[in-house]
Amino acid sequence: MNEPERKGRAGMDARIDQVVTSGEVTVDGTAHEMENNTYVLGDDEEVIVIDPGHDAAAVLEVVGDREVLAVICTHGHPDHVAAAFDIAERDEAPIALHPKDLLTWRETFPDDDPDIEMADGGLFGVADVQLEVIHSPGHTPGSVSLFCEELGVVFSGDALLATGPARFCGEFPDFPGQLNSVGEHLLTLPPDTQVLPGHGDQITVAAAEKKFDSWVTAGPDAPGEEDE
């Protein structure tokens, strides 16, 4: 596990710890080692964990003695949900997922569904900030992004990486839909919004907007990382 990267804003209690972990996922029948970004958002008392893909122990080490209020999965692929129950059970926290990703979720957890069905416009509160759910389908039907206006960030899952929309495998890819989600729902956020993706480095909305036309032209061959 890499050391967590911490982000915050002056005058606010809420901060973001980014935990990079790695694990094996299977893409089209082939096993790959993949790094994922898990985010811990909160203050000294309470947190929300976003995209618990690998290594629950590493994430809980960063959480420490703070209460986990919720575990939010931006979509149902295994590298974004695999550690959800191991993290949630410590504080009996609910797990949240968009219902359109239940079929994908059940490939990893066939017998246990999430507790909360997210919907576009839904809100989660933690510390002195809120997360707004933005339904951003394409990578999967139930992909969501989470906008925190107070901190000026959006957790984009695999809807948008610094290198472009994440390439996808599995049963439900919709690249035109993914581009539509990026253009209509993410690139319309304030230009200085920091995009915190499920893999790799961050990017600003303004920087992503400059690359958008090239992603449209490239189509499914746009350079986003291959992801499960």
For each predicted feature, which ranges?
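Active-site HxH/HxHxD metal-binding segment of metal-dependent hydrolases
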Residues: 33-34, 47, 54-130, 160, ...
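Short polar/acidic secondary-structure junctions
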Residues: 123, 137-138
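Conserved S/T- and glycine-rich ATP-binding loop of Class I adenylate-forming
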Residues: 41, 74, 136
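Short Gly/Pro-enriched turn/cap motifs at secondary-structure boundaries
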Residues: 29-31, 115, 135-137
